[in-house]
Regions:
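An acidic/histidine-cluster motif and surrounding catalytic segment
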Residues: 1-96, 100-257
């Protein structure tokens, strides 16, 4: 079994009440030889957030729905994990939610990514499609795995690899929250980072719902006529992404991750 590069620290986000989830993840990670640090997830059901952490006005405008306590908990749990990473002094962090499932190549892929760390700042798993409009392979890895730049990315936050540059930029700019974390994290231009996805995906999602981010989904969307602002926000975000997309296609100067 290939060992994980020691420059990578692994964080697993898990709610205190999700003990079965933790046990299942322990087995999955043990099977591929990965040790981890558990991050006690912020439970949005009970957490009292501040205005510095969450902007309700912008959330309603950009998401078109009432506040979701689960989404707030998820967002702040990832923020907490990034803070722990920065304090760790490590070069890279793999951040996981407790519903991620890994294939047998996962550790080898992580080690390969470290060996080409000059190329990326943030790598998402299970978010790219092979070919198709807007999905461009920018670098081969091994056995058909490739890094992709995606003009129209899938939102996904269950597994991603970041370096210290990305972590510090995210930590400085993530708050206050006004969209779910998996929607915010794709804004590579805002954080000045090189962000890619991998195909074929080495990570999938367990079919059962994760506790992380799901609590509060009973919050209903507003009627259509109150959601027009959501359309404008999404169009604007895609335009900005399209304008900056070329940056992901340029070959970077070699640098240490």
């Amino acid at each position: 079994m290939e060992k994980l590069n020691t420059d990578i620290i692994v964080f697993l986000i898990n709610l205190d009440r999700a003990t079965k989830r933790l046990s299942e993840m322990e087995d999955r990670l043990s099977n591929i030889g990965i040790d981890y640090i558990r991050i006690s997830a912020i439970d949005g059901k009970f957490y009292k957030y501040s205005e510095k952490e969450y902007c309700e006005k912008l959330y309603k405008r950009c998401c078109g729905k009432k506040t979701s306590s689960g989404e707030i908990g998820c967002y702040l749990s990832h923020y907490k994990s990034i803070e722990y990473f920065i304090k760790s002094g490590k070069e890279y962090a793999l951040i996981l939610e407790d519903d991620a499932v890994f294939n047998s190549d996962f550790v080898k892929i992580l080690n390969k990514l470290v060996s080409i760390s000059y190329f990326w700042d943030f790598v998402k798993f299970n978010t790219a499609r092979d070919g198709g409009f807007g999905n461009i392979a920018v670098k081969g890895l091994f056995n058909g795995y490739k890094l992709y730049a995606s003009l129209f990315p899938k939102t996904f936050s269950a597994a991603y690899l970041i370096n210290t540059k990305a972590a510090k930029s995210l930590y400085a700019k993530l708050l206050p929250m006004y969209v779910p974390f998996d929607h915010e994290m794709i804004k590579f231009w805002k954080y000045d980072i090189r962000q890619y996805s991998i195909f074929p995906s080495p990570v999938s999602i367990e079919s059962k719902d994760s506790f992380i981010g799901t609590y509060g989904k009973e919050s209903l969307k507003f009627p259509f006529y109150k959601r027009i602002s959501v359309l404008f926000y999404r169009i604007f975000t895609q335009i900005v992404r399209s304008i900056n997309f070329y940056k992901l296609l340029k070959s970077p100067n070699k640098r240490k991750g």
